[in-house]
Each structure stands twice: as C-alpha cells, then as structure tokens.
Design a protein with these regions (language model features):
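Residues immediately within or flanking Cys/His clusters that coordinate Zn2+
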Residues: 55, 67, 82
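Extended interfacial segments that mediate partner engagement and assembly in macromolecular machines
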Residues: 26, 75-138
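Short cysteine-rich clusters marking metal-coordination/redox-active sites
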Residues: 58-61, 70-73
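Extended, structured, electrostatic nucleic-acid-contact surfaces
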Residues: 1-19
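Long C-terminal interaction/binding lobes of large macromolecular proteins
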Residues: 120-190
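Short Cys/His-rich Zn2+-coordinating modules
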Residues: 7-13, 36-56
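Conserved phosphate/pyrophosphate-binding and hydrolysis machinery centered on Walker-type P-loop NTPases
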Residues: 19, 38, 51, 63, ...
Length: 190
C-alpha cells in the first residue's frame, strides 16, 4: 500500500472484495469515483446504505423484499398452484427475466428442518399442485430434489426440474437468458 494513499487503497480493496471484480477493475472503479465523479461515489454509497437498511427476506418464500411479504407472494395474478424452488433469491430475478414462469417461488438456501417445515406450510397454504426445481444441476442437488420429493410424497404434487440446457455445475446466475428460457420450456418430470 502506497503511503499517503491508504484511503484510496481501502476503496480498491472494498471493490476487489466483490464477486467478479479483480484488481484492475477495482483500481479503475476507485480511480473513476475519486478522480472523475465524486457524485457517483456518493450516490453509490447512499444507495448501498438504503439497500442494506430496507431490503430483507420475505417471511413467506425467502425472496428479497422491501416489505415483510414480497411482491411475488402478494401478486394475485401469479399461479398459486405452481411453485418454483430455487437455492438463492437472486435466481428468482434471473428466472423472471426469462418470462417463462408465472407461478410462486420458494428459496431454500440450506435444507434443514426449519426450511422443510416452511416449504410444507407454503405448499399447503397455496394448494400447490406442481413444483419446478430450478437449481444448479449436480449429483448433490439431485439428492436434494429426491429428499424434498420424498418429504412431500403424501401430497398430490407433480414434480419437475428445469431441463438440461443449463450445464451441470453452472450456477443460474451464469446462464444466458435464452438457455434458461429453453431449459424452463423443456422441463422434465421427475
């Protein structure tokens, strides 16, 4: 760290700690904000502060929300009988961009008893008939799917997962919209 530029390098390190931002990009961002556009830096800082204060998890489905219950859960035009299970709230926005799904969502970041109980309550409350698993294809996640299917076997639910248009081991955030759209359209029963 250069003496006299500690604050600048702290900013570089902060940017570098973000996903997909390397040293060069972090340097460019920090330099731009400090030397070219102070207003941009202030706006980013204010926006981050507001987001951290106001965004939380939906108490029903686990999606991101600025309210106790998210817009997806409150939207009466969505199909209550179809549920898409994802492993991250950010996956919901990726699926929404595909414009191929109009049901409800449920986020299971970690499969534990609390998450399973919440899922069962959500399924019962919404009278779910179909569950679509939109999770990263892998052997571990296939076991995850089978476990949930087993726990819900007493209910009359059809299970499917997005088709293998999504490469095995690739996170949904790294899949292009066309591939994701085709994968959702080609979902397979399990």
């Amino acid at each position: 760290m250069k003496k006299g530029l500690e604050k600048f390098y702290e900013l570089v390190e902060a940017f570098e700690s973000l996903p997909t931002i390397g040293k060069k990009s972090a340097l460019r961002l920090a330099y731009h904000i400090v030397m070219n556009d102070n207003y941009c830096g202030i706006k980013i800082a204010h926006t981050i502060e507001n987001a951290l204060k106001n965004i939380t998890k939906c108490v029903k489905c686990g999606s991101m929300s600025e309210h106790e219950i998210c817009e997806f859960c409150l939207d009466d035009s969505r199909d209550n009988t179809t549920l898409c299970i994802v492993q991250s709230a950010k996956d919901i926005f990726i699926i929404e961009d595909s414009k191929q799904f109009d049901g409800k969502y449920f986020v299971i970041e970690e499969l534990d008893q609390e998450a399973l109980d919440a899922l069962i309550s959500f399924v019962d409350e919404n009278e779910v008939e179909t569950i679509l698993f939109a999770i990263t294809p892998s052997i571990a996640n296939d076991a995850f799917i089978l476990y949930i299917e087993d726990k819900l076997k007493t209910k009359d639910i059809r299970f499917s997962k997005i088709a293998q248009g999504v490469p095995t081991g690739v996170s949904l955030e790294n899949v292009d919209i066309l591939s994701l759209s085709k994968a959702i359209q080609s979902k397979v029963s399990i």
